[in-house]
């Protein structure tokens, strides 16, 4: 279900509009190419998960300046009446290409490409980055947490700690894409048609005369899904014994609980879970689940798994929904080509003293190269959009910075897949977005195409993003031209 049926046109940085007015006054209407990409995987990860495309689509569809928008801009006393009149009739007429949501992606490759008249392409920069950066960050962080859980279910529990309602809502969406099995966020469940999950709070226990009574009444209310929070008073002396007592009473009454277990929210989770597991098993409840929460992240999960914690379900909140240790994604939006009067795209390059900030010029696309035998990703290849490749021929891959690092793939041993697909054509959306659940399933398949060495939490193997020979030659020529001796 679409959420952003709202107009976000003014959700932009002021300088986008001041530049637009400058282009308008100069009569600049040429078509340009902008690329969205990032330079480093967040959290030291070996890959990222791109997300947020569906919200970009909604944003572009609803892009228009209302009377109130124009009136507000007039009140700033920055913009001339003729430019404001132009904005009154503004709508997006360009093309957008993007990598599908849920794809694994790597630094410096275009996640999204805008081809549009300069004023249109300039305006959409800020909001596209806002939408892609946030959800890609949370989807990537979630992937790390899911990896650390090693097959256990991860529930997204972060709404109350998110940086505002939008971050909570779209963070939950991104978390499902990244691999969470459900969310506590009821609005996210409604809007995105994803599973909602939860247990109860300590306050539930505290409002009853005693813990046993609270547990029993909760089990009577929810016999099909009953997880009892056992650490309000004393986990091993009170909480677990009272939970077992309730489970046994329902079993003896011929009404055994269908899906049931306990939740730990404090203390030494490894120690308590192993003790609780032993108590549950000895009481005849080996199928009772043990869920844990309490400021978890991928590192703590990794350690708890290594210590043999008897936990099979995890509620992860603050560290996931805020990506606490790596709170930004770093996506950028850079001009890469301008179309001339002959309809040809002239490559443009941004040069920097910092090598990693030098951009890749031209109207480009990306091909993912897979090892045919295993289906695993070998590399990504950035090339000009009009380049084609023959999988029956040898393919030379080389590092664009350390060009002596080369790999030749023999024809017939690899396959290639173009990653950028058309989303908008001449201002019209031509793409049908999959559901969030479908994106999550696709993301799981995408991660299966990664080597285990790339998925590990610590010092992951790098997936190379290479340039075609033609693109490399053009980039080198532009750099040589810019640094020509006087």
Residue ranges and their predicted role:
Residues 197, 262, 290, 312-314:
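Hydrophobic residues within beta-strands of alpha/beta enzymes
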Residues 28, 32-88:
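N-terminal, Lys/Arg-enriched amphipathic/low-complexity engagement segments
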Residues 1-31, 40-42, 78-79, 84-93, ...:
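Buried, small/hydrophobic-residue-enriched core segments of structured protein domains
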Residues 33-35, 93, 154, 332, ...:
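A residue-level signal for beta-strand positions that form part of recognition/binding surfaces
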Residues 58-63, 98-101, 105:
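An N-terminal, globular interaction/scaffold subdomain
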Residues 96-102, 414-419:
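Short acidic, Pro/Gly- and aromatic-enriched capping/linker segments at domain boundaries
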Residues 71-72, 140-144, 158, 455-462:
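Short coil/turn segments at secondary-structure boundaries
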Residues 2-30, 43-45, 283, 288, ...:
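Gly/Ser/Thr/Ala-enriched C-terminal appendages of enzymes
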């Amino acid at each position: 279900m679409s959420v952003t049926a709202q107009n976000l046109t003014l959700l932009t940085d002021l300088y986008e509009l001041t530049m637009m007015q400058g282009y308008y006054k100069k009569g600049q209407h040429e078509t340009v190419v902008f690329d969205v990409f990032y330079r480093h995987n967040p959290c030291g990860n070996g890959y990222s998960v791109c997300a947020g495309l569906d919200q970009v689509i909604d944003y572009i569809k609803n892009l228009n300046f209302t009377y109130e928008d124009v009136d507000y801009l007039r009140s700033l006393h920055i913009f001339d009446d003729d430019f404001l009149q132009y904005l009154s009739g503004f709508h997006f007429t360009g093309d957008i290409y993007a990598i599908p949501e849920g794809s694994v992606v790597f630094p410096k490759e275009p996640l999204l490409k805008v081809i549009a008249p300069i004023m249109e392409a300039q305006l959409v920069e800020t909001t596209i980055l806002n939408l892609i950066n946030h959800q890609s960050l949370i989807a990537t962080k979630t992937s790390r947490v899911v990896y650390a859980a090693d097959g256990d279910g991860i529930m997204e529990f972060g709404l109350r700690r998110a940086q505002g309602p939008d971050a909570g809502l779209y963070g939950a969406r991104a978390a499902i894409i990244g691999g969470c099995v459900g969310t506590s966020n009821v609005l996210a469940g409604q809007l995105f048609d994803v599973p909602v999950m939860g247990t109860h709070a300590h306050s539930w226990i505290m409002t009853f005369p005693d813990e046993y009574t609270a547990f029993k009444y909760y089990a009577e209310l929810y016999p099909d899904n009953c997880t009892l929070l056992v650490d309000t008073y004393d986990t091993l002396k009170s909480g677990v014994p009272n939970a077992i007592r309730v489970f046994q009473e329902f079993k003896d009454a011929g009404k055994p609980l269908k899906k049931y277990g306990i939740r730990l929210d404090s203390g030494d989770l490894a120690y308590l879970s192993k003790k609780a597991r032993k108590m549950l098993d000895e009481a005849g409840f080996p199928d009772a689940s043990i869920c844990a929460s309490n400021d978890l992240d991928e590192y703590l999960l990794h350690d708890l798994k290594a210590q043999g914690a008897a936990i099979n379900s995890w509620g992860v909140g603050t560290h996931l929904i805020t990506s606490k240790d790596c709170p930004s994604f770093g996506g950028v939006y850079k001009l890469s080509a301008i179309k001339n009067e002959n309809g040809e795209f002239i490559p443009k390059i941004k040069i920097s003293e910092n090598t990693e900030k030098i951009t890749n010029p031209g109207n480009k696309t990306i091909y993912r190269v897979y090892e045919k035998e295993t289906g695993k990703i070998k590399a990504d290849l950035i090339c000009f959009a009009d380049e084609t490749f023959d999988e029956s021929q040898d393919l030379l891959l080389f590092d664009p910075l350390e060009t002596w690092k080369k790999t030749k793939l023999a024809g017939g041993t690899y396959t290639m897949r173009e990653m950028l697909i058309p989303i908008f054509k001449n201002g019209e959306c031509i793409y049908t977005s999959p559901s969030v659940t479908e994106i999550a399933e696709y993301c799981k398949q995408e991660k299966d195409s990664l080597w285990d060495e790339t998925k590990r939490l610590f010092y992951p193997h790098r997936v190379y993003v290479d340039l075609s020979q033609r693109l490399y030659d053009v980039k080198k020529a532009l750099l040589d031209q810019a640094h020509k001796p006087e």
